[in-house]
């Protein structure tokens, strides 16, 4: 079985939310899946990564997380994901997964795909540099439109409010535990890790959601725990990512500087006093009177007679 995911960066084995969820889940149950870092989403049935290709047999590639979890449960490895959960715990896991999809995932989409500053500075540049031209233009446009459709026209304030509440709910549920269902990871842990890790690790000029996440130390600890135990990077990956760090720092710094400059310009424009309203009203009144008189004379409503004086 092969798991095709987007390449690694920013201290993560992959920066894509779904790819992280698939990878984390496979590692948590020690599945002998072969991981393939790929930048060829067109090979997937839905044109997206991750994709699970089953080498033996003619089974179709899998791109759905729940179906992948079912496959892992039947693979026969010693550690079976979610095996120790009771019926009630499984129902709670499903409910929580649905809650996160509707309240946290939209904010993740907005952060990386709908926020123009983040998109232009990080998302667009990263994907464009990993995909060949002109396919990168097509893919980015398609992915961005898909994200906007999923957001459904929600405003930024509403999206962030739901996400902040979801993060607080996650923090409360985790508490002092190592994982969300005790001391053993479940598919919920893989799901949550996929949402949180990019928010925590990828540098962004608009970082409101990152700041909120960083204010939940147990969630930060959770991400670091999963990363160190199940998803450590190789020396080659660390060196490659280190070589790109200065470039990303430069891009983020420039984006933040441009953002502050634009804010300063906007504030300066707002500080310029408007023309006195009384003067405008007087000028408007005079102009209206002149036009009214001219119109009346032109249409004959007002007649002007000129009498010539007869010389004696």
Swiss-Prot record:
Compartments reported by the entry: Mitochondrion outer membrane
Reply yes or no: does the keyword Transmembrane apply. yes
Kindly state which keywords UniProt assigns to this record, in alphabetical order.
Membrane, Mitochondrion, Mitochondrion outer membrane, Protein transport, Transmembrane, Transmembrane helix, Transport
UniProt lists the family membership as follows:
Belongs to the metaxin family.
| Protein name (database record) | Metaxin-1 homolog
Main site of residence?
mitochondrion
* Task performed by this protein: Involved in transport of proteins into the mitochondrion. Essential for embryonic development.
What GO terms describe the biological role, i.e. biological process, of this protein? Answer: mitochondrion organization; protein transport
Organism for this UniProt entry: Caenorhabditis briggsae
Subunit note: Associates with the mitochondrial contact site and cristae organizing system (MICOS) complex (also known as MINOS or MitOS complex).
Membrane spanning residue stretches: 282-302
- Tell me which Gene3D superfamilies the record gives: 1.20.1050.10
GO cellular component terms, A-Z: cytoplasm; SAM complex
